[in-house]
């Protein structure tokens, strides 16, 4: 059937520190660039794609931005082909503070996020997106 404008995974940022992506079996991964345009990403064979997650964004006080990404459907001629991807989500231990690193705070870049532990932040976000009840 025709998937129309549907996407395989809607626009989002990962909650964790970083996500490592080994080469997917088919195209479809797109990232949102600074100009607000979706750009297709294909891993170079033998390499990884690294997505910055929300936790790393907090630690760096926004110096490193979470990667906004999605997975779109392939062109019509490839609809019947499966797409496999092996993401590795790196999460810190729950008690790790996600406080902004001192070297990432300045007079021109004040603290952007409240202090919180990784576990509390993960729980907060999972409740926020409806994957966990409070």
Predicted ranges, named:
Residues 1-134:
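C-terminal flanking tails of non-heme Fe-dependent oxygenases
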């Amino acid at each position: 059937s025709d998937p129309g404008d549907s996407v395989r995974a809607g626009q989002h940022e990962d909650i964790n520190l970083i996500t490592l992506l080994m080469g997917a079996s088919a195209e479809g991964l797109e990232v949102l660039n600074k100009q607000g345009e979706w750009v297709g990403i294909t891993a170079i064979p033998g390499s990884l794609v690294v997505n910055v997650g929300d936790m790393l964004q907090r630690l760096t006080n926004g110096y490193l931005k979470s990667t906004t990404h999605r997975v779109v459907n392939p062109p019509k001629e490839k609809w019947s082909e499966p797409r496999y991807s092996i993401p590795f989500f790196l999460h810190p231990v729950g008690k790790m503070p996600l406080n902004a690193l001192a070297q990432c705070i300045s007079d021109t870049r004040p603290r952007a996020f409240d202090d919180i532990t990784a576990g509390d932040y993960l729980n907060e976000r999972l409740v926020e997106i409806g994957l966990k009840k409070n």
